[in-house]
Structure formats: C-alpha cells, structure tokens
Amino acid sequence: MAETESRPTNFIRQIIDKDLQSGLHKQIHTRFPPEPNGYLHIGHAKSICLNFGIAQDYQGQCNLRFDDTNPDKEDIDYVNAIKNDVIWLGFEWHGEARYSSNYFDQLHAYAVELIEKGLAYVDFSNQEQVREMRGTLTTPGTNSPYRDTSIEENIAQFAKMRNGEYKEGECLLRAKIDMSSPFMCMRDPALYRVKFAHHHQTGDKWCIYPMYDFTHCISDAIEGITHSLCTLEFQDNRRLYDWVLENVTIDVVPRQYEFSRLNLEYTVLSKRKLIQLVDEEFVSGWDDPRMPTIAGLRRRGFTAASIREFCKRIGVTKMDNMVEMSMLEAPLRDELNENAPRAMAVLEPVKIVIENYPQDGVELLAAPNHPNRPELGSREVPFAREIYIEAEDFREEANKKFKRLVLGKEVRLRNAYVIKAQRVEKDEQGNVTTIFCEYDGDTLGKDPADGRKVKGVIHWVSAAHAVAAEIRLYDSLFTVPNPAAEDDFVACINPESLTVKQGWVEPSLAKVDIDEANIQAFQFERTGYFCFDKDSTTSKLVFNRTVGLRDTWAKIGD
C-alpha cells in the first residue's frame, strides 16, 4: 500500500491558506493537547494526523502539550505511553514536550488580573447550589450571592484558596460573564477549584488547579499557537475561549476551529467507557487487541502507515458521521497484501497419512515468501509422510462447488504435490481423526502428466516438523454498530470477540525474531493476516489475527 501522497484539502486548510495569503500569519503553529488520564485511541490518531500533518505540509510547528490540570486522574505512565504513540505514528513534536502545568504561575497571575478587573469572583456556594443557579437550556441562570463581592475581598479570598485555607469543594473561582447567556458555558464558568492532590509534574506546590477552558486558551496563546483545532463538542466553548483571551493581557491571540470527531462502528471511543472496560476487566488492559487504543491496534498488528492512510481517507469535516470498520481495515489489508511474507498455519488440524510416501522420508520444498515479489526470496518447508490440514478442508462427500479434499478425489497441497483421499479413520463419536491418502510424486511444481485437472489447493504443515502455536482470533468487541447509543453498552459486548485456537505453524516462523516495537506480520495462506503477540516466547508462539483476507463487515451489515 502506498500512502496517499497528494496534500489533502479541507475547510481548515482553506482557512490556513487564506491566513497565509493575507499575511495574518507567517508560520503555522498547531498543537496536540491530550490529557494524560488514559491511552490514546484511534480518534486521537485523527487529531494527531491533522495537527502534525498540517505543520509538516506548511513547514510549520506542532507542539505536544499535556493538559495536566486534573492531577488525581493523571499518571506519568500515561504521559510516556502518549509520547510513544505519537512517535510510533511517525510524528515529531516541536522542541520539548510541554505541560499546561508549566504555565501554572502565569495562569494564576491571569486569574488575579481578571479579579482585579472585576471579571472573576470567589463563590462559596456548594456544588448543588451552583448547578441550580446555572439554570437550564430554556431558563436563564441566577446570580450567585457572592457575585458582587468587592475586588479587594475576592483578591484576599483567592489568596486563601492558594494558601490552602479552604477545603475541597468549599469554594471556587468563577468568571463574571452573563448568567442569562443562551450558552451554558458563559454562565459564570468555574476558573479554579481547590484540590489537594500530588501532581506528577509540580508535586505538592499547588492546592488550586485551573479548569480546562481557562487553561486551554491561555496555554495556546503562551505557545504562539495560530490555529487551535478541537472537535465539535467544544464549539460553544469557543465563546469562552475568546472571552478569556480578550480580557487578559496577552500578545498572541490564537483562533479555535472545530471539526467532527471520529465515530467508529462496533466500538466506543469515550475515555470514560474505555476506562470502565479496563477497570471491570472486560478486556485484558489498554493494549488489548480488541481495544480501539493505538496500543491495542499496534498489538493487533495495525501499522502506523495504515492508520495514517485511514485518517487521510476519512478526511476532516464539520459533519458528524459513523465510519464503517471496513474503512479502518482496508488500508491495512492493502499494505499487508503487498508486503507481508506468506506462511502456512493450521488452526484446526486433522492428520493426513500419505501411505505411498517413504516412511522416514523428508523433503525440503521451496516456497516463495510472496507470490508477486520474488525479491523477498523463498523459504524451505519440510514435507513428510504425515501432515496436518484444516479439518474444514476435508469432506467425505461434497458437491462440485467444494474445491478441497473429498474422499476419492484429488487436491493440490500448496507448494507441494497432488494427493488423493482413499479412506478415513474415526473416533467413537464419528469424527474423522485421520485421512489416508496417496500422492502423485510427479506433480511437484507441475500439473499431472496425463492432463487431468486438479482445481483445489489447500495449505498444510508437516506433523513432525510443525511448531505448536496459540492463535488468537479477534472479532469486534461489540455486537451492535453503535454501542455508545445503548443504555447499557457493556450488555452489548460480544462474547465471541476472542477465540483461542491451539494450532500448528510451519517451522520457519519459530526462527523469526520477536520484536514488540516492530511487529512482524504474516499472511497465513488462505486464512488471514497475523502477527506475533507480545506474549510470544521462543518456547511458546502466540499469534494475533490482525485482519481477514477479505472484508467481512459488509456481510454483518446485510
């Protein structure tokens, strides 16, 4: 798969083009500002590709800034995981990674400035009272009894907040805007709250922490961000973004623009819901291959290039829509079809005994690593008297549409000989345990000499040489296309989202170096694309199914 090389066009890039042409900006400066309270997911990948992609295409800069204003939910492990994901996706941020906490002193000074201008006040109303005073979407709010406290008293009270003289929840600093505004975010929003929590960057220096809407815009301005790109749920908050910057003394005034967030079928992208899946052990962790996290997708075998290509294909708009899972898989399937070396693996084996093959005979047959790329070379596959094939590749009786092994008929073994099934052996339950065959020793790499047609081809492994492997077959985590819309999304979890098979793989796979940072993918012929899992060891191979050979989502939708 070749990544799309042409520069994408969208409404944000059109705005940037106009800003550059008009001379409003000489250099474009964007940022990616995740909160370090969880792992990044595929929705974040869209934002990463947008912000870093714009900086690359316009020879600008993109900052990585951690929005770390909520210390009791954040962790340095999340910080490190986020950095790793951005790098893995192929991007490099400008300068050092930044933190909103870098600006806590400046943010505090700006809060004092708002108080001195009569634009902020300390409110001692409790949480329920604040909620009631806000009003509703159809009724205006009411002023707090603390709204008209003098500037001098507010300065003194805010200093006491800073000094730890008030308890958590006892008071908060609010902006003084308009309690009758039709926009809820403008009804005297909170700017600071008391929180006695250890911070992963600032330690115990602070016991008051700024709110996101106050921090976000000022951090953008301090860093010289020209275009602050957010998802549509922050559209109304742009009014507060602009209000803060208009009322503090700051040189750079960035502009916020909103685009639609990613909604992907058969998964959830809400961080709260993802945390619930992890905490309640519906999945094995943040990097469970069923998770839509970048770590989970990477472990499943998705490549950075395929994710970047997916983000290019879905584009950037202002219209929310649900993206089909097939859109995510298509670039990956294209890439793996082009690049993944081939191998043979049998997931549900049944034994074949080739009765006319020498008892102790072994041949090393040449098998191409890729049918269309001879430069990838070939490998040796051992062939012997006893082999395994997939149980589903054999029937005692079948119609003409079945092109695999049938009793009394022939089939070709991939990269090997033509065999014919003669008889079977069954267990007490009537299940076929062994198929006895004969092979045509003159058909290696060529058709039968007498011109008879053998249409079917099946894969196999040598019973004596194959390596045991645990093979994990992943499916969608949910049974409905939009689980987030359900009252109880966990009730929609797919009980068959993971099936574990104990199969056999050709011995060449045991010689591959297992590198978690650079996961090796393979096409298991006729089965799908697979990769090593991090649980794999030299004594126990573990493979994850990354994606099937063909798109199966269309069938689910029918």
Curated annotation (Swiss-Prot):
Its EC number is 6.1.1.18. This is Glutamine--tRNA ligase. GO terms for molecular function: ATP binding; glutamine-tRNA ligase activity. NCBIfam families: glnS (TIGR00440), PRK14703.1 (NF011291). A motif ('HIGH' region) lies at residues 34-44. GO terms for biological process: glutaminyl-tRNA aminoacylation; glutamyl-tRNA aminoacylation. PANTHER family: GLUTAMATE--TRNA LIGASE (PTHR43097:SF5), GLUTAMINE-TRNA LIGASE (PTHR43097). The keyword Protein biosynthesis applies. It comes from the Bacteria. It catalyses: tRNA(Gln) + L-glutamine + ATP = L-glutaminyl-tRNA(Gln) + AMP + diphosphate.
